[in-house]
Amino acid sequence: MAGKGYIVRIIGPVVDVKFDEKELPDIYNALEVTNPQNGEKLILEVEQLIGDNTVRAVALDSTDGLTRGLEVVDTGKPIVAPVGKGVLGRILNVVGKPIDEKGDIQAEDYWPIHRPAPKITEQKTEIEVLETGIKVIDLLAPFPKGGKIGFFGGAGVGKTVLVMELIRNIAIEQKGFSVFAGVGERTREGNDLWLEMQEAGVLENTVLVFGQMNEPPGARFRVGLTALTIAEYFRDVEGRDVLLFIDNIFRFVQAGSEVSALLGRMPSAVGYQPTLATDMGELQERITSTQKGSITSVQAIYVPADDITDPAPATTFSHLDASVVLSRKIAELGIYPAVDPLDSTSKILDPAVIGWEHYQVARGVQEVLQRYKDLQDIIAILGMEELTEEDKLIVQRARKIQRFLSQPFFVAERFTGANGKYVPISETVKGFKEILEGKHDSLPEQAFFMVGTIDEAVQKAERLKGSAA
């Protein structure tokens, strides 16, 4: 028999509910209350037992219309998410309800969103590289299959476009499933993503789960777990390799901070919740490879005021296997994706995993770019003429490498007018190796801008030569 209680206090999204002594619900249980204003069921999640047979719960939708004394029913279980192939191509909210107006979801099962991480004995320890087809990532910050990758960057440097390109490449080139969690981002961006995925034909391999900026903090705080639960089903039951995108993990922390303050907890550093590390760990530890399949997670991380030492990005760092740093300076040069080749790293940039040739080319590229960076002060003060012949050559090659790290994206075709390019890792390594060896010293640097493979750069140089003549 489900326990029943009644509302005794409402403060914004926080609702206190009183139960009989023997019917007190567990922490994280979902409670249901019918909103008299619209007749819809509102889900509350129990967060605290505050004494006097009263629980403090956080609402996962607006509490407008609720009044004291309304009856609340304990469902006896946590929030559940629909899982299985029936959710592919659909848009859900935090409680698994469809928000795309395409009718009910034919779920194969319903799983609770609070689940333990896989046991250490179930996890897979071999490391495999996940090919993305994006040159700068595959060369300098390769993604491990089943790993966690962070996209760091301030506002407007291209995190979401990069995420969309990855979804497209994995769905079309590798026929993989993707789960996208829109955590506290703009509703317009979610709508754009859905429409663009329909155009690109990748929607049938993707599930979109949204808890957007306008929603209460409870929804934004839990939507990542709903998406992760859907991904876990594909991994554990269907044995698939799944890509989980979280845009934006900072908003997950921000929502947690709001919930924490509303629950009356004492804030910690910079006003964040005292449970920051635990909240992050509960989400991140479930993202891993098992013997059955893998979940590779790509997380866009907004860096507040471009300060990478802020507790939110700093806590996320400790969980990551690779970090892709997007730089405003590179975006200002018009080079997209605006990935910083010197700040972006990966734990698997190791000859034992990627092979000697790839490793040496990657380190060679970073060495040339670092030398160019060191020389920029001299160039700014004295000009190129004061450099040695060797340094002049390094500057020329570095500028070509910088431009060759750019790439036209499929999802940006309608903005740029350039056809998107998918570049295999072997072609990426070959191209940069040839630039480092000086095979293309005679080509103009603009030939390397916004092309795919090195052969395309050579063809572009021929065209430029022809048009100049």
Curated annotation (Swiss-Prot):
Keyword match Membrane: yes
Source organism, top-level taxon: Bacteria
Keywords per UniProt: ATP synthesis, ATP-binding, Cell inner membrane, Cell membrane, CF(1), Hydrogen ion transport, Ion transport, Membrane, Nucleotide-binding, Translocase, Transport
EC number: 7.1.2.2
GO molecular function terms noted in the UniProt entry: ATP binding; ATP hydrolysis activity; proton-transporting ATP synthase activity, rotational mechanism
Keyword ATP-binding: yes
Protein function: Produces ATP from ADP in the presence of a proton gradient across the membrane. The catalytic sites are hosted primarily by the beta subunits.
Family: Belongs to the ATPase alpha/beta chains family.
Subunit composition and interactions: F-type ATPases have 2 components, CF(1) - the catalytic core - and CF(0) - the membrane proton channel. CF(1) has five subunits: alpha(3), beta(3), gamma(1), delta(1), epsilon(1). CF(0) has three main subunits: a(1), b(2) and c(9-12). The alpha and beta chains form an alternating ring which encloses part of the gamma chain. CF(1) is attached to CF(0) by a central stalk formed by the gamma and epsilon chains, while a peripheral stalk is formed by the delta and b chains.
Protein name: ATP synthase subunit beta
Organismal lineage: Bacteria, Thermotogati, Thermotogota, Thermotogae, Thermotogales
